[in-house]
From Swiss-Prot:
<comment type="subunit">
    <text>Part of the 30S ribosomal subunit. Contacts protein S5. The interaction surface between S4 and S5 is involved in control of translational fidelity.</text>
</comment>
<dbReference type="InterPro" id="IPR005709">
    <property type="entry name" value="Ribosomal_uS4_bac-type"/>
</dbReference>
<keyword id="KW-0689">Ribosomal protein</keyword>
<protein>
    <recommendedName>
        <fullName>Small ribosomal subunit protein uS4</fullName>
    </recommendedName>
</protein>
<dbReference type="InterPro" id="IPR002942">
    <property type="entry name" value="S4_RNA-bd"/>
</dbReference>
<dbReference type="Pfam" id="PF01479">
    <property type="entry name" value="S4"/>
</dbReference>
<comment type="function">
    <text>One of the primary rRNA binding proteins, it binds directly to 16S rRNA where it nucleates assembly of the body of the 30S subunit.</text>
</comment>
<dbReference type="GO" id="GO:0006412">
    <property type="term" value="P:translation"/>
</dbReference>
<dbReference type="InterPro" id="IPR036986">
    <property type="entry name" value="S4_RNA-bd_sf"/>
</dbReference>
<dbReference type="GO" id="GO:0015935">
    <property type="term" value="C:small ribosomal subunit"/>
</dbReference>
<dbReference type="InterPro" id="IPR022801">
    <property type="entry name" value="Ribosomal_uS4"/>
</dbReference>
<keyword id="KW-0687">Ribonucleoprotein</keyword>
<comment type="function">
    <text>With S5 and S12 plays an important role in translational accuracy.</text>
</comment>
<dbReference type="Pfam" id="PF00163">
    <property type="entry name" value="Ribosomal_S4"/>
</dbReference>
<dbReference type="GO" id="GO:0003735">
    <property type="term" value="F:structural constituent of ribosome"/>
</dbReference>
<keyword id="KW-0699">rRNA-binding</keyword>
<dbReference type="InterPro" id="IPR018079">
    <property type="entry name" value="Ribosomal_uS4_CS"/>
</dbReference>
Length: 206
């Protein structure tokens, strides 16, 4: 499946919630009618079957983290192999993606922008350049912006924007050095309560 390149707000309207695909300079409800389905007339959302609800939740999380269908299914399979709660394992694996960590640290205003920074070799992990967005970040790994990329306007702007957001408790960031430490894997209580990962588990368990 190809990566979606269309309007980002349309995806958030489709899922009925902010997927954090835009920079966050303005509240998303000031940009579009988030509670209204996409389309010229904002058709009413029909009642979904159990399968439809499960599918929508999977699509919501997949789009939020910017992961393709095949990748997402592979994450689920890995989560199912690990000990503990499969749904929680899935969210933790997604949170450990390098592009997500770069976003969480505030070096990018969106996960898509973070993915681009990683792909363009602007990011280092423990002093080594890593250009794989799906790279798995481990506890105590140090993620930093390469020296030659530190003056990029988008990174400076993203850090200013990040100062307005609540800081993740599992990450420590030194904005002046453009460097952060992934202190630990987040627990379920650290993450969004708007995600119902059990619906995704039920979908893939069929």
């Amino acid at each position: 499946m190809a990566r979606y390149l269309g309007p980002k707000l349309k995806l958030s309207r489709r899922e009925g919630t902010d997927l954090f695909l835009k920079s966050g300079v303005r509240a998303i409800d000031s940009k579009c009618k988030i509670d209204t389905a996409p389309g010229q007339h904002g058709a009413r959302r029909g009642r979904l079957s159990d399968y439809g609800v499960q599918l929508r939740e999977k699509q919501k999380v997949r789009r939020m983290y910017g992961v393709l269908e095949k990748q997402f299914r592979n994450y689920y399979k890995e989560a199912a192999r690990l000990k503990g709660n499969t749904g929680e394992n899935l969210l933790q694996l997604l949170e450990q993606r390098l592009d997500n960590v770069v976003y969480r640290m505030g070096f990018a205003s969106t996960r898509a922008e973070a993915r681009q920074l990683v792909s363009h070799k602007a990011i280092m992990v423990n002093g080594q350049v890593v250009n794989i967005p799906s790279f798995n970040v481990s506890a105590e790994d140090v993620v930093s912006v390469r020296e030659k990329a530190k003056k990029q306007a988008r990174i400076v702007a993203a850090l200013e924007l990040a100062d307005q957001r609540e800081k993740p408790t599992w990450i420590e960031v030194d904005s002046s050095k453009m460097e952060g430490t992934f202190k630990r894997v987040p627990e379920r209580t650290d993450l969004s309560a708007e995600i119902n990962e059990q619906l995704i588990v039920e979908l893939y368990s069929k």
